Structures are given as C-alpha cells and as structure tokens.
C-alpha cells in the first residue's frame, strides 16, 4: 500500500507484528522503525519488488523506541547496507545492565505472544539490545538528511519514545502512541509513565495533524486528530484491566524506571 503526498510517497510494509513505513523521495528514502529482526527480509523484498530501488537508497532508519517490533531490524540493516540509525539520545539505556537484559527477554517473549495471537507462524525474534545510534535525537530536532521532518519526544509508553512530524503535510508517525485494536483506538501496552504520556498527548493534540501513520492501525486520515489524542487522556483515568496489569508488571525491569524516579 502507498499513500502519495506532494513531495514524497509513504509505503506501508506489513511487518511481522507492526506496520513499517518507508518514505520515498526521488533522492533517497527514510525508514520509520525497522520492525522485528525477522522483518529485514520483508523490507528487502518490498524495496526490490515494489519500490524497485536498492536498500542502499535508504539514508536513515529512525527507531521510535526499543521494543522488538520497532528496533529489532536496525542493527542488521545497518550492518548489511550501511544505513545510518537515529533514535532518542538515551535509547540505549533501556536494555542496559542486568535489569535491561531481563527486560529485553521479556519484551521478546511478549512480542512472540502478540504474533501468536495474530496467527503468525513462529519466527526468530531475539535481537541485539543495544543499537548505538549514529544520530542522537532530542525533542524538536530536525532529522538528518530529511530536515522537513522533526522528531518529537513523547515519553510514557517507554521513556524514549519519539514520533515524527512533517509540518507541511500535517503528517505524524505516532509509532505506538495509539493502537487500533479491532477498530477501537486504545492506549499502548504498557503505559509506564501516565503523567508523561498525558503530556505527550497534549503535545500531539496541539498539532492537529490531518494524517496519522500508526504502527498498529495503518494510515488514518482524520478531520480532528486533536480529539483523538485528548480521548486517550480520558482512557488513562480508567482502571487497568487484567491484561494491562500483567503487561505492566512484566515491563518494569528496565533500569530506566529507577533512573527516572518511578
């Protein structure tokens, strides 16, 4: 699937767990997240068979956060094709130390559970948990090679979440900030920092973008995205259900929880 804008085309690659977005310009391509480690082959096949361009034309991979279906393929794509990787400046703290090692294993375990629930065949999921970004991103920073895009720091799902904003096209790649589950717009799993994610939703609502690229939900063109983000804040007030509680309990071993004073 592809969606055309005035200066680029957005291709949707259906990954093992999440949608991966490839932004095609005449002079290069931008990959929004790298999917799972087993999605490298899917990205390769899409570029060769659909876009008809070599993977070396991808100038930058932006990793929105460290979960397996977003960061899993980054190291492999950089090693194989020399593609630069950008991510939040503190992203490698997420899986650092013994707690981070345990968190990495648990996140891969939970990701496999999601794939199984989606009736996917079992595939390799483990990936090296440190990405050493070539470019460290901070809030409101323009992307290297693609200065028409800005990175926005939107913590709450993890501490290092970033979304990508294209002001001219009123377009947002929101990664996991909202998940479309059977037509219902829901909070991500987990929400590790409710106050921070509430502030993040306020930030995103203020942009009133007309198009959302969702890692779990596809491309959404809407008249009022502000209302959608504000409705997520209302969901934060509801008591967590058993699944939310379980995922939260399995997601608190990263040393970033203590470092952030949570």
Go through the PLM ranges and name each one.
Residues 1, 122-149:
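Short, conserved active-site entrance elements at the starts or edges of catalytic domains
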Residues 1-50, 163-177:
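Conserved beta-strand hairpin/beta-sheet module of binuclear metal-dependent hydrolase folds
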Residues 7-12, 61-64, 149-153, 188-192:
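Short, flexible loop segments at the rims of nucleotide/cofactor-binding pockets, characterized by
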Residues 30-32, 62, 85, 171-173, ...:
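Residue-level marker for buried hydrophobic side chains located in beta-strands
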Residues 36-38, 127, 150-231, 235-236:
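Metallo-beta-lactamase
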Residues 38-40, 48-135, 234-239:
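Active-site HxH/HxHxD metal-binding segment of metal-dependent hydrolases
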Residues 57-59, 72-78, 141, 152, ...:
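Soluble, non-transmembrane catalytic domains of enzymes that act on hydrophobic metabolites at membranes
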Residues 242-262:
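C-terminal regulatory/interaction regions
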């Amino acid at each position: 699937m592809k969606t055309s804008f005035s200066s680029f085309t957005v291709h949707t690659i259906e990954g093992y767990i999440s949608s991966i977005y490839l932004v095609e310009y005449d002079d290069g391509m931008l990959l929004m997240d790298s999917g799972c480690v087993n999605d490298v082959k899917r990205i390769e096949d899409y570029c060769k068979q659909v876009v008809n361009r070599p993977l070396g034309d991808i100038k930058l991979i932006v990793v929105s956060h460290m979960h397996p279906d977003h960061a899993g393929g980054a190291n492999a794509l950089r090693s194989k094709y020399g593609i630069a990787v950008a991510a939040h400046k503190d992203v490698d703290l997420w899986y650092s130390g013994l707690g981070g090692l345990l968190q990495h294993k648990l996140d891969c375990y939970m990701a496999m559970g999601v794939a199984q629930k989606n009736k996917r065949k079992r595939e390799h999921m483990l990936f090296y948990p440190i990405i050493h970004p070539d470019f460290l991103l901070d809030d409101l920073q323009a992307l290297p090679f693609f200065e028409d895009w800005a990175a926005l720091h939107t913590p709450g799902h993890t501490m290092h979440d970033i979304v990508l904003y294209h002001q001219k096209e009123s377009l947002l790649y929101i990664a996991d900030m909202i998940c479309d589950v059977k037509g219902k717009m829901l909070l991500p799993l987990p929400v590790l920092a409710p106050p921070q994610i509430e502030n993040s939703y306020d930030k995103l609502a203020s942009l009133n973008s007309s198009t959302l690229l969702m890692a779990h939900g596809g491309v959404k063109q809407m008249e009022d995205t502000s209302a959608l983000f504000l409705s997520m804040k209302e969901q934060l007030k509801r008591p967590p259900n058993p699944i939310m509680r379980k995922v939260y309990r399995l997601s608190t071993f990263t040393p970033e929880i203590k470092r952030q004073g949570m």
